[in-house]
Structure formats: structure tokens, C-alpha cells
Amino acid sequence: VSDTSGGENSRRPYLWEYRQEHREVVSAALEQRFDVSGENGLADQMERVAAQLVDEYWHDNWRDIVGIVDGSFLEGYDDFNIGAAFRNAAVVSTTYALLSRCGMQPGDYFEHEDFLNVFDFNTPQTVAALGTAISQSSELVLRQLEITIKNYEREKLAERSESHERTDLHPQRGLSDSRPEPD
């Protein structure tokens, strides 16, 4: 028995798509939500939002992360360097995910060397810790983008509907009388 096909009255989910026309509203929403300016472009803004969220994640979870590095390439690092490696790996990965989901070309913004810290997280526990930080950080941003883009599209659709629902009647004329004229 399979429950993967659409039912008779099922609706397909609306998957938002970032387009250039969304740039200003998306940048403004990110600035309002995360207090990070978009003056240097959306890619830079996303990277700085990612850095802010990853810093918050590290601040809340650093003790747990430092406690699971045994057996990984991070073993032997002091707390400061574990934190630097974690933040670098999480920021670049989160930014990559955000740019990729928005249809931007992450390869235009990153080089191979930017991802080298990711390879230090080579045990199941360290991979899980890094993955959780990336997932939680990118989810916060992507949910904000989803809300912003959906609202923008609804407003655009409402404006379009409103302009098409207007009558093209001249106010002084009105509708013509459909009754036959008396003889």
C-alpha cells in the first residue's frame, strides 16, 4: 500500500523561488529580522547573517562540541581553535546552502580552500554537531525568505487581480440599458 500519490482533493505545496525581483524585499526582511545590512549585496548579507547565527550556536553549544572532538582531526586543538574551525566550517557551509537554495551560483563566491575546515569534522559526532548548526542556521534564514517571498507574491497577485477587476466604464455613462426601447 502506498500513500505517496496525490489524492483527489490534494494540493501541491507551493515551493518558493528566489528571483531578482525579490532582491530588495528579501534584503530588507533580512536586515529587519537579523539586523544585518545588505549594502554589499545579498550574498554578503547572507554570509554575515550565517556568521551571526553560527556565532550564537557556538556560544550556546561550545562545551558540548569541545567534548566530542576526540578521535577527529580536531583532537589536540585548544578550545579557541576548535571554535574557529567550527565557525569557519559552519559559516561557509550555511552560506553555500543559502546561496544554492536561492538559485545563486555558490561557486562564484567560494574557492576549495574555503571548505578545508569542514574536513576536520571527520567523526560521526563532530559531523552531526556541524550538520545540526548548519541545518538550524539555514532553516532560520530560509523560513524568513519563504515568508517574505510568499507575501511579496500574494501582494503582487492581489494588485494584479485588483487592476483586472476594475471596470473600464466611464463614470458619466454607466452601463447601457439592456431593455428594448419603447416604440
Region spans (language model):
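Short acidic DE-rich linear segments
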Residues: 182-183
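N-terminal accessory/interface modules of nucleic-acid-binding and processing proteins
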Residues: 1-175
